[in-house]
Amino acid sequence: MAAAGPSTRASSAAAAAALSRRGRRGRCDETAAAKTGAPGPASGPSLLVLSPPLLQPPLPPRPEESGCAGCLEPPGEAAALPCGHSLCRGCAQRAADAAGPGCPRCRARGPGWARRRARDDGQADSEVLGECARRSQPERCRPRRDGGAAAAGPRPEQEPRAAPAEPDFIFRAPIKLSKPGELREEYESLRKLREEKLQEEKPSEDQIHKLLPEDTETGKRKMDEQKKRDEPLVLKTNLERCPARLSDSENEEPSRGQMTQTHRSAFVSKNNSYSLAFLAGKLNSKVERSQSCSDTAQERAKSRVRAVPGNKAKVTTMTPASNPIIGVLLSTQNNRCVSAPDLTIEKRLPFSSLSSLASLHKPERSVSPESNDSISEELNHFKPIVCSPCTPPKRLPDGRVLSPLIIKSTPRNLNRSLQKQTSYEASPRILKKWEQIFQERQIKKTLSKATLTSLAPEMGEELLGSEGIHSSKEKPLVAVNTRLSGGQVLSEYTGPTSADLDHFPSVSQTKAEQDSDNKSSTEIPLETCCSSELKGGGSGTSLEREQFEGLGSTPDAKLDKTCISRAMKITTVNSVLPQNSVLGGVLKTKQQLKTLNHFDLTNGVLVESLSEEPLPSLRRGRKRHCKTKHLEQNGSLKKLRQTSGEVGLAPTDPVLREMEQKLQQEEEDRQLALQLQRMFDNERRTVSRRKGSVDQYLLRSSNMAGAK
């Protein structure tokens, strides 16, 4: 290895590249000819003496194989390419900088990493290749190694040499990942730990498997013992609470006394009758099922006798005061279906002995076509619907079973309801609830905002509500003392018929008042106790039709008839007007007086000026004449007063003048009372928030604000 540095090698490589290849080859040929004694190219022909092949040294490698692929010179610092060729440092630098192919020999472009490696860190490879080239061709590498000084001089004689020594083996120590046997030791230790854990868990699992069956057997044995101890008590309790428990089928024997709640369909036949406990007044008795239409009285009697004898000691005597069926609605006129039995017969029976209860016979449903029951024909084909609820009864904390009180409805014969009365023996609470429901329905009907399709006469003017509602919707009542010119007398108004009162129980309570008020045949008082019931669609029309059957056919009577029919619909006042102020007259409102076009009063005055104003329609079905409500109300009131003044209701007649003054005074008093009532209600609804009062606003504290 020469001692010259890299700069010397680079300069020698540049100088060698500058020389002509041909001149160098010529000089090499001349030198070889001088050594062998052969003439040069300028001399004449001569024989070439070859050495024997045994003494001939091995041929050196071709320069294309060992030299640079670019300049064909033995590289001092070679760079290996991926294709197998080598380049000197200069050619490798030019190949890396150029955009062309990487290898000038095979035109194979190396990858980027190869080019970067050849450019940057190809020092080690170049040294190895240079050492190989110097060993293989020492004669050709010596002038370049010596700086080119001996290149022009004669070359030393080539001596035969032995085969080139093989390059030294470069040993590189392998990377040690682990020591020998270390992985096996680690695996063995992990396996031992796993086996130890399994050995520790195995005894506990075995113990658990042993204890589980024992615990299960112990729990089952305790449950069986508890069940055996409780079974007699349950049987005893069931027998006490349901002594008349019957089987669900006629072919089965009665059950052992256990109250197994069966949820059957509503159309399944039930053979249970009312239990004795329910008839004895116990609230925890079982609710009975309805009877089937196809069952006969004999079969029910047999099943009842079959279930009763074991429970004779449990029956107690019953008094009428302890009877809990007072809330059940009864009908004394119509026949009953089996789903709603007639309990009035059972109320009259003495409950002191069991034999009377065993022989109790419920009325069978009539199957004849002349039956009063309106649904009997349908129920001949279908089984009756079970009236009792299918949900199990509620159990009280003390263990008693609370059975709900069932109100059974009764089908009514609608053909007979118009001729005969039907009395309801019900509790006052139910009657009060009925009346409340009727009033609520009437209020909803009156306050409805729906568009009217027909103008019923003054149907929207009636309201059931507070005084404020009365003040905005009602019209004051006017009594006009008119005597018919023909001398005819109106028939006495006796109120709604008994058939109409069947639909309204609260009206039947006030019949005595109506009968006491209707004293003379010339007076028609205004019935005002139950306004919502008297005005109900078809019943109202039948009312008007019945109450005027006794009237004559004269025009005056017809006019009075229309006035009376209108007066009967204004029934929202809670008292009847004094009898002394209504002397044989017909009650009308101021609004209804406008509808009279021609009406002869007693003094002969013809009322014609009333026909100038049109008939006002319902409030809900027409537009308001004024933009604001209070102006319209005040305007209508002024118009009414002007109209009454224009008509001049016989100023010479003291009775009419006194009547009008009294009505005006009553109207003013009523308006004042309503205004005061509204002020009082407003003050009562207004909450005083002043400081110091009970309802004052409390300041929000900081902690409450922070919490939010």
UniProtKB/Swiss-Prot annotation:
Catalytic activity: S-ubiquitinyl-[E2 ubiquitin-conjugating enzyme]-L-cysteine + [acceptor protein]-L-lysine = [E2 ubiquitin-conjugating enzyme]-L-cysteine + N(6)-ubiquitinyl-[acceptor protein]-L-lysine
Residues annotated with Phosphothreonine modification: 410, 554
Location, primary (coarse class): nucleus
Keyword field contains Nucleus: yes
Positions where Phosphoserine occurs in the chain: 12, 247, 249, 339, 368, 403, 409, 485, 644, 693
Biased amino acid composition, Basic and acidic residues: 132-147, 195-243
Metabolic or biological pathway, per its Swiss-Prot or TrEMBL entry: Protein modification; protein ubiquitination
MIU motif (motif): residue ranges: 665-682
Compartment(s) of residence: Chromosome; Nucleus, Nucleoplasm
Motif UMI motif positions after renumbering to this chain: 205-213
Ranges spanned by the short sequence motif LR motif, renumbered to the chain: 689-701
Residue intervals of every RING-type zinc finger in the record: 68-107
Impact when changing residue 697 to A: Impairs recruitment to DSBs
PTM per Swiss-Prot/TrEMBL: Phosphorylated by DYRK1A; phosphorylation increases RNF169 ability to block accumulation of TP53BP1 at the DSB sites.
Region (Disordered): 1-71, 96-169, 195-262, 491-555
Keywords for the protein's UniProt record, in alphabetical order: Chromosome, DNA damage, DNA repair, Isopeptide bond, Metal-binding, Nucleus, Phosphoprotein, Transferase, Ubl conjugation, Ubl conjugation pathway, Zinc, Zinc-finger
SUPFAM superfamilies: RING/U-box
Effect listed in the UniProt record for changing residue 673 to G: Abolishes ubiquitin-binding
InterPro entries: RNF168/RNF169_E3_ubiq-ligase, Znf_RING, Znf_RING/FYVE/PHD, Znf_RING_CS
Xref: PANTHER family: E3 UBIQUITIN-PROTEIN LIGASE RNF169, RING-TYPE DOMAIN-CONTAINING PROTEIN
Subunit relationships: Interacts with DYRK1B.
Role this protein plays: Probable E3 ubiquitin-protein ligase that acts as a regulator of double-strand breaks (DSBs) repair following DNA damage. Functions in a non-canonical fashion to harness RNF168-mediated protein recruitment to DSB-containing chromatin, thereby contributing to regulation of DSB repair pathway utilization.
The family this protein is said to belong to: Belongs to the RNF169 family.
Domain notes: The MIU motif (motif interacting with ubiquitin) mediates the interaction with both 'Lys-48'- and 'Lys-63'-linked ubiquitin chains. The UMI motif also mediates interaction with ubiquitin. The specificity for different types of ubiquitin is mediated by juxtaposition of ubiquitin-binding motifs (MIU and UMI motifs) with LR motifs (LRMs).
Name of the protein in question: E3 ubiquitin-protein ligase RNF169
Gene transcribed to yield this protein: RNF169
